[in-house]
């Protein structure tokens, strides 16, 4: 009943012209200079005035949880045995059409992957310079989305750039190791599109 009601509400919001620019799909966490900072500021201001903003505290907690969910799905898929796995990351910026990586989900993901002993190769149309400035060469950088998947065990789709939407899955599967998996942080793809690549999505 709750799921049906949630889908009904989501459908109503989607059909509202004044709300059509809102991010209402499940995603791997929100970043940027506004949302995380504003939520933290509101919580802090409320606390100074004696208020416990439980809803905003929950929003902040859930957003951080979403940034970790891709890694957890990846780890579970491989039964916890992920040391030495090579992974591709598609997208570094917190959203398309920018190189802004403030509070970006990709940073949380990269940190956890490296600590787990994984090898990371990332590509973003415009944010790789910013990523190098932030974390240097602790990961490798691909020339394009196809370059990142060579001998990779998994792909993380993190930022919804248009150029990631219609890849040649046959070419990608041949370039990857056996039994590859795509972890889709934007719920853009469908399992039937991937030509034999395992598919994990948000939600």
Where are these regions (language model features)?
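Structural/interface elements that position substrates and couple domains in central-metabolism enzymes
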Residues: 1, 8-203
């Amino acid at each position: 009943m709750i799921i049906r009601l949630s889908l009904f509400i989501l459908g109503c919001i989607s059909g509202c012209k004044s709300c059509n620019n809102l991010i209402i799909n499940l995603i791997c966490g929100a970043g940027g200079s506004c949302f995380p900072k504003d939520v933290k500021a509101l919580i802090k201001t409320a606390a100074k005035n004696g208020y416990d903003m439980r809803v905003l505290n929950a929003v902040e907690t859930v957003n951080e949880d979403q940034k970790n969910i891709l890694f957890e799905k990846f780890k579970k898929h491989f039964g916890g045995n992920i040391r030495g796995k090579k992974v591709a990351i598609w997208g570094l910026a917190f959203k398309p059409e920018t190189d802004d990586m403030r509070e970006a989900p990709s940073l949380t993901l990269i940190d956890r992957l490296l600590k787990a002993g994984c090898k990371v190769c990332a590509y973003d149309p415009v944010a790789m310079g910013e990523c190098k400035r932030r974390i240097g060469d602790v990961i490798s950088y691909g020339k394009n989305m196809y370059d990142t998947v060579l001998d990779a065990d998994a792909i993380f789709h993190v930022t919804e750039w248009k150029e990631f939407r219609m890849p040649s899955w046959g070419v990608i599967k041949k370039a990857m190791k056996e039994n590859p998996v795509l972890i889709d942080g934007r719920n853009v793809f469908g399992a039937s599109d991937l030509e034999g690549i395992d598919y994990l999505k948000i939600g």
